[in-house]
Amino acid sequence: MKLLEPGTEIDGFSVLECIHSGGMAHIYRVEYAVGAPNPGFPLAMKIPRMTAGDGAENIVSFEVELQILPTLTGPHVPRFVAAGDLERLPYLVMEYCSGHTLQHWLDADERPDVATIARLGAAMGRAAHSLHQQNVCHLDLKPGNVLFTHDNHAVLLDFGLSCHAHYPDLLAEELRRAVGSPAWIAPEQVVGVRGDPRSDIFAIGVMLYELATGELPFGAPSTQGGLRQRLWMAPVPPRQYRPDLPEWLQETILRCLEPEAAKRHPSAAHLAFDLAHPDQVPITERGQRQHGLGLRTQFKRWIKAVG
């Protein structure tokens, strides 16, 4: 579908401008047409790409978001407004949230200080916990999908790869393969396990690692073999890149990135608490680590992962 021109009207909504044109959807600022009631907040319309060359994932992801977004409430998600008919013109209208995505801090010339990293991480943890309390796992948390408002709330965006505990998992049923963004996908997602809230904790850990070091802990692999390495490989300790980082922060980040979900924080609320109360973080070998794990330990992890 070609981009909509400003002034185009769709089901009582008037297009103002295109604010994002991505591989899976176009997003527009819109407003109610003349004579319609004012909702009291700005609006955005998301229209999935559905040209002949686009895969089934685009439309399935739209169906997933259409299924999940209307069920969500609270300050950490955009408010749902309306949806278009799937057969005629599929679209979602939701609250437009202003602020900066996490990418804003990653694009800065200097790495943020420890207090900023902890503040951003705690906000992400609280937002993820709110989502998990509503029986939803995001499963595609990454810098472009986390927005920070001017009052320092984290707002989670794009629920096209999400999973609701009480609804059919359309992506698992239709695609039957791991789906997610390669740099941030959790090890269990790589092997097809969806619906574990601790997968979102892993993704937050990847973002904290990149905030702290400017590096991705597992790179951005493009092959299944590259993705599977995170099932056993340990990332370079953040303090090796940045010695000024405190042990408690490295401890917290590396705990998020444990290949076994059971070894991560038990909930996103626990992660948020640790980031807000560094004096209460118990320091283990993870926090004191100066170098990557030895070959023997890596081999044991590999045996456990493949066995």
Stretch-by-stretch model annotation:
Residues 46-49:
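Conserved beta3-strand ATP-binding lysine motif
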Residues 52-71:
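AlphaC helix of the eukaryotic protein kinase fold
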Residues 83:
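Activation-segment/catalytic-loop signature of the eukaryotic protein kinase fold
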Residues 87-101, 105:
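Conserved short submotifs of the Hanks-type protein kinase catalytic core
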Residues 120-121:
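Activation segment signature within eukaryotic-like protein kinase domains
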Residues 126-136:
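Protein kinase catalytic-loop region centered on the HRD/HxD motif
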Residues 183-283:
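C-terminal lobe helix-coil module of Hanks-type protein kinase domains
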